[in-house]
From Swiss-Prot:
Belongs to the peptidase S16 family. Homohexamer. Organized in a ring with a central cavity. GO terms for biological process: cellular response to heat; protein quality control for misfolded or incompletely synthesized proteins. This is Lon protease 2. Its EC number is 3.4.21.53. One of its GO terms (molecular function) is ATP-dependent peptidase activity. The keyword Transmembrane helix does not apply. The active site is at residues 685, 728.
């Protein structure tokens, strides 16, 4: 658009009707001129007529920019009165015209008149009000437009025209015509009745474009500065290379630096890491190969350039196939399998899902580590495992700072470089055995690794730049979480993997272990056949564990024995049944624990939970002449000692109900012992068997040898819930005990125990100490006996 000075025609009076010239993609403002290219035949005739008549027309923006022929509904209701100042016919038959606008009009009753539209027009008077605020807005717009003209490289006479605008609205239209606005925004400015609102809107639009221009200018200046610096660096580097060449040194260094720079160019990595690498390459280029720091710098660059910054393995997201793979590799473990399949299902819906942080907790040999490998195979990812057992130095996790001699990254970064992928399945084995000393606390360093809100920018001390661990699927394993700090435990999704029953071990042996061990020893089904009765005999008489490692070792012994027999000339297949197991493995190693013990008053069977699974414990008590002392042995922890004290206090308080003479306690010293004295023991779950053993000792009533019990006691006589119910039930079953007593609040935990196990066992629920005494103590030889009410 141009200014009024270029010849806008002013017409005296305004006709009632005007022919309409619709504009596409533009708006013509009052007091401005606009060059137009007219291609449509109807509007060429209109231009001819108006130009010959020296007449007027209504110049209005078209709503639908795509429409070739505008209808009444396609044009806006407000436009300008225009006249054709100049008309030039082109060689292709089209017209080039210049239209000047005089004033703003409103269109009414738009109708079709032959090839073009016409409408009744009504002049819209311009708002010429003034105020200090309007003057300030106009001044601000003038100054901003001057800056805009400078940044946008527009002709300077445009700025002069804006400065010389006589009226605020004239300034508004002049500035708006040179801004990059949409038709809707341009039309809204034209239709604004108030000067103040128009000034504010145009100032807003201009400020928005000024910000873009200033940003573009800053970027251009920055790029120019970088280019100038690179040219200068290149010139100086060439000079340095020439000097070194004259001195006979540095040619190999230059080639090495160029090779590293080429590797960096081809590598996709974060900007911060790239900046660190570029800086180190530049530093390396200034060093002599004989300098002590040269190899340190070179090793650091190798680590930076070989990290899998953007290298990922594609996930194999097939939930059904994943279920098949998990079932092929592991028997049971339904809770873990369900969690992995849920993760895959969500990953199928949300591709940028952060990797879960799982923690498998259970006894040794239940398949925690192998489960991680199976998960990696299911996902199609690489598998990485590090053992944290005995790790005491924080640098093992975070790495050493490069200032130290022999510095290396931590084991997290080392592992990722080794597998060459930024989304492996990363197993942190034995997390419960991590240590701490004067060199730092590795468990605190793991807080950042295992926190989804932080590990996207994990910083290794050696690398010195963040590495994104959010795509890594971390799996921690441990036997017991008691030693794991609460903050670290809170960051992990703990999934408990209990021990296996004899039936489950049999299935695992049949489906996995027998085939694996026979193959490991070069045997086939033509050489050996191991019967189910033989496997059960090994499970019951030669192993006592929650997992299957001892079972696997014993099966390996059977296979070695068979391989020896075949090597000596025996013909296969050799059938192994239960009767042949003692000949191979020797005498039976484990009998039911209750069957191996002498019984009498003062002995009760309890259930304990250890990192290796559940097991039976025996509470033994004896009374000697004394003065009421309580002696505790068997490496008991503080909690277990307190349970013994509470049990004795309860029995003394209810001596009358139990038909015990009160003086008996004052005349006797009581000794409580828990066998396996070399093994430390602690926990509240021995409270119930302790009170039973003490009551049996003082009353002379024997305890049933076919029952085991667990539960914490209170001085008021309540039985409180304890942990590890499934493991304890399995331990009782392994030991041949088919009747157990558990706290009432733990009955809900029986849902984790298979139905076939519960059907074979009798489980009593305990609410008070009265319940356990009534169930566990046999009647007195002298009389029926009684138990206290609590």
């Amino acid at each position: 658009m141009a200014s009024e000075g270029e010849g806008v025609l002013k017409k005296e009076g305004l006709p009632e009707k005007l022919r309409i010239l619709p504009l596409r993609n533009m708006v013509l403002y009052p007091d401005l001129v606009l060059p137009l290219h007219v291609t449509r035949a109807g509007y060429r005739r209109l231009a001819d007529e108006v130009y010959r008549e020296n007449g007027l027309l209504a110049v209005v923006a078209q709503r639908n920019e795509e429409a070739e022929e505008a209808s009444p509904a396609d044009i806006y209701q407000v436009g300008t009165v225009g006249s054709i100042i100049k008309l030039l016919k082109q060689a292709d038959g089209t017209y080039q015209i210049i239209v000047g606008a005089s004033e703003k009009v409103r269109l009414r009753n738009i109708s079709q008149a032959g090839d073009y539209l016409e409408a009744e027009v009504e002049a819209v008077p311009e708002d010429r009000s003034t105020s200090p605020e309007i003057e300030a807005l106009a001044l601000n717009l003038r100054m901003g437009f001057q800056k805009f003209v400078s940044l946008a490289s527009l002709p300077l006479d445009l700025a002069n025209f804006a400065l010389n605008a006589e009226r605020p609205m004239q300034l508004v239209y002049a500035v708006a015509s040179h801004l990059a606005l949409s038709v809707v925004e341009r039309q809204s400015i034209l239709e604004m009745p108030e000067t103040k609102a128009a000034l504010e809107h145009v100032t807003f639009y201009m400020t928005r474009q000024l910000e873009k221009l200033e940003l573009a200018q800053r970027i251009q200046d920055r790029v120019k500065s970088v280019m100038d610096k690179r040219q200068r660096d290149y010139y100086l580097r060439e000079q340095l290379q020439a000097i070194r060449k004259e001195l006979g040194e540095g040619e190999d260094t230059s080639e090495e630096v160029h090779e590293l720079a080429a590797r960096l160019r081809d590598l996709e990595m974060p900007a911060e890491a790239r900046g660190a690498a570029e800086k180190e390459i530049e530093r390396l280029g200034r060093m002599s190969p004989s300098a002590p720091e040269y190899h340190v710098s070179r090793n650091y660059l190798d680590w930076l350039l070989e990290m899998p910054w953007s290298v990922s393995t594609e996930d194999r997201i097939d939930v059904r196939q994943a279920a098949v793979i998990l079932d092929e590799d592991h028997f049971d473990l339904e809770k873990v399998k369900r969690r992995i399949l849920e993760y895959l299902a969500v990953l199928q819906l949300k591709k940028d899902l952060k990797g879960p942080i799982l923690c498998f907790v259970g006894p040794p040999g239940v398949g925690k580590t192998s489960l991680g490998q199976s998960i990696a195979r299911t996902l199609g990812r690489k598998f990485l495992r590090i053992s944290l057992g005995g790790v005491r130095d924080e640098a093992e996790i975070r790495g050493h700072r490069r200032t130290y001699v022999g510095a290396l990254p931590g084991r997290i970064v080392q592992g990722l470089r080794r597998v060459g992928s930024n989304n492996p399945v990363f197993m942190l084995d034995e997390i419960d055995k991590i240590g701490m000393d004067f060199r730092g606390d590795p468990s605190s360093a793991l807080l950042e690794v295992l926190d989804p809100e932080q590990n996207f920018s994990f910083s290794d001390h050696y690398l010195g730049v963040p590495f994104d661990l959010s795509r890594v699927m971390f799996i921690a394993t441990g036997n017991l979480l008691d030693t794991v700090p609460a903050a670290l435990k809170d960051r992990m999704e703990v999934i408990e993997i209990p021990g296996y029953t004899a039936e489950e071990k049999l299935e695992i042996a049949r489906k996995f272990l027998v085939e694996r061990e026979t193959a490991n020893h070069g045997l086939t089904s033509d050489h050996i056949r191991i019967g189910e009765d033989a496997i059960l005999e090994i499970i019951r008489s030669y192993t006592r564990e929650a997992g299957v490692r001892s079972l696997q070792r014993n099966l390996a012994s059977v296979c070695r024995n068979t391989a020896k027999a075949i090597a000596e000339g025996a013909s296969g297949p050799i059938h192994i049944d239960a009767s042949g197991i003692p000949e191979i493995l020797g005498p039976v190693q484990f009998l039911p624990e209750t069957a191996t013990r002498s019984w009498g008053c003062g002995i009760a069977t309890g259930l304990a939970w250890t990192p290796s699974g559940g097991q039976l414990i025996f509470i033994e008590t004896l009374r000697t002449h004394g003065n009421g002392k309580l002696l505790l042995t068997g490496q008991l922890g503080e909690v277990m000692k307190e349970s013994a004290t509470a049990a004795l206090t309860f029995v003394r308080a209810h001596a009358a109900d139990l038909e015990i003479e009160g003086e008996e306690f004052d005349r006797s010293d009581i000794h409580v012992h828990v066998p396996a004295g070399a093994t430390p023991k602690d926990g509240p779950s021995a409270g119930a068997p302790m009170v039973v053993a003490l009551a049996s000792l003082m009353t002379g009533r024997e305890v049933r040898k076919d029952v085991a019990m667990t539960g914490e006691i209170t001085l008021r006589g309540d039985i409180l819930p304890v942990g590890g119910i499934k493991e304890k039930v399995l331990a009782a079953r392994r030991a041949g005990v088919k009747e157990i007593m558990i706290p009432h609040a733990n009955m809900k935990d029986l849902a984790d125990i298979p139905d076939h196990l519960r059907r074979d066992m009798t489980i009593h629920e305990l609410q008070t100490i009265s319940d356990v005494l009534q169930l566990a103590l046999l009647p007195s030889p002298r009389q029926g006996g009684s138990s206290p009410r609590s």
